[in-house]
Amino acid sequence: DIVMTQTAPSALVTPGESVSISCRSSKSLLHSNGNTYLYWFLQRPGQCPQLLIYRMSNLASGVPDRFSGSGSGTAFTLRISRVEAEDVGVYYCMQQREYPYTFGGGTKLEIKR
């Protein structure tokens, strides 16, 4: 199975600042068709996970453009610019390069008060 690793379990950010959340995969997620099958989700407290980014860098419908995704075949970054209070929750990367699909352990974003 492909192992997804998020080394930072948490991030503490001041509103208005930017933050980057990283993720690594044990195998390249770049497919021969040119797509990189890395996805980012946000699970807000008490809610179901919400898709933010699909195929590494594509913004999901309805997601603010403060969110962006980038990376290579095995190293990926989710960047949030101008962090807002509504951005709190746990951010997960997930690979859909091959079955079984696997998730990182998550990075919890918290806001400095």
From Swiss-Prot:
Region Framework-2: start-end pairs: 40-54
Q: Where is this region: Framework-4?
A: 103-112
Q: Which GO terms describe its molecular function?
A: antigen binding
List the source organism: Mus musculus
Q: Which GO terms describe its cellular component?
A: immunoglobulin complex
Q: Which InterPro entries match?
A: Ig-like_dom, Ig-like_dom_sf, Ig-like_fold, Ig_sub, Ig_V-set, IgV_Light_Chain
Which SUPFAM superfamilies does the entry link to? Immunoglobulin (SSF48726)
Which stretches are annotated as coiled coil? none
Q: What is the lineage of its organism?
A: Eukaryota, Metazoa, Chordata, Craniata, Vertebrata
Q: Which UniProt keywords apply?
A: Adaptive immunity, Disulfide bond, Hybridoma, Immunity, Immunoglobulin, Monoclonal antibody
Q: Disulphide bridges in this chain?
A: 23-93
Which residue ranges are recorded for the region named Complementarity-determining-2?
A: 55-61
Q: Where is this region: Complementarity-determining-1?
A: 24-39
State the Gene Ontology BP annotations: adaptive immune response; immune response
Q: What is this protein called?
A: Ig kappa chain V-II region 7S34.1
- Any one Pfam family match given in the protein's UniProt record, by short name: V-set
Instruction: State the remark under miscellaneous.
Output: This chain is from a hybridoma-derived monoclonal antibody against the streptococcal group A polysaccharide.
Segments carrying the region annotation (Complementarity-determining-3) are 94-102
Write out the ranges of the annotated region (Framework-3): 62-93
Q: Where is this region: Framework-1?
A: 1-23
